[in-house]
Regions:
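Extended, charged catalytic domains and RNA/DNA-binding interfaces, predominantly
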Residues: 1-197
Length: 197
């Protein structure tokens, strides 16, 4: 961790090249639910912690609790960036929490705070949409990647495959977020999108 912090500092060039200290939280229970954790803080602040990993807990709520404490103690910002949601086997955008409990306002508010953007494309494929959920979109099959979330669901019924695809891709969840805003007063899926190499 100290090497990551030192490298970020070494390559930082104010006004020319911005670096962030960060790491990957790699939860894998039931499907890949990976998040990049990015800190805005100084080396002193980020160096005061040991990153919270999926070895401590696979539940993102536990990660967010750890990061909330960090924010309160340091005064710095931190975000988590979901990525490879296409490989989540429907786990990333489930209709309940990791512990299979109903969503609460507090849960949705915390998720909104920590996840303002998601990665929708990278070399492991596209997380924007899927041909099963966007059959009329000629680009829905673009960059499916070497491993698709539905490879794990090949023996499932078409309805289950569609459900898993909807819970793994950004375009579907944007609609879900609008409905959640009506129900809960908060939209946890109002996010920007990024692409990575």
């Amino acid at each position: 961790w100290s090497e990551v912090i030192n490298e970020a500092e070494r390559h930082y060039q104010p006004g020319k090249f911005t670096t962030f200290v960060g790491y990957e939280y790699s939860a894998t229970e039931g499907g890949m639910a990976h998040r990049n954790v990015m800190f805005s803080g100084s080396p002193k602040q980020t160096g005061s912690i040991i990153p919270f990993s999926a070895f401590e807990s696979q539940d993102p709520e536990d990660l967010w609790k750890f990061l909330t404490k960090y924010k309160e103690e340091s005064g710095d910002d931190v975000i988590t960036i979901p990525h490879n949601t296409n490989l989540s086997n429907g786990q990333f955008f489930k209709n309940e929490t990791f512990k299979n409990t109903p969503f609460s306002y507090d849960y949705l508010q915390v998720r909104t705070e920590f996840e303002p953007i998601i990665e929708v494309t990278q070399f492991k494929g596209d997380s924007e949409t899927h041909p099963l959920i966007s059959p009329d979109d000629s680009y829905a099959n673009f960059e499916r990647g070497w491993f698709d979330t539905l490879n794990r669901a090949r023996d499932d019924s078409l309805g289950v495959k569609i459900d898993k695809a909807e819970r793994s891709h950004a375009r579907s969840v944007l609609k879900k977020g609008l409905n959640m805003k009506k129900e809960f007063g908060v939209n946890p899926f109002k996010f920007g999108v990024i692409g990575s190499t």
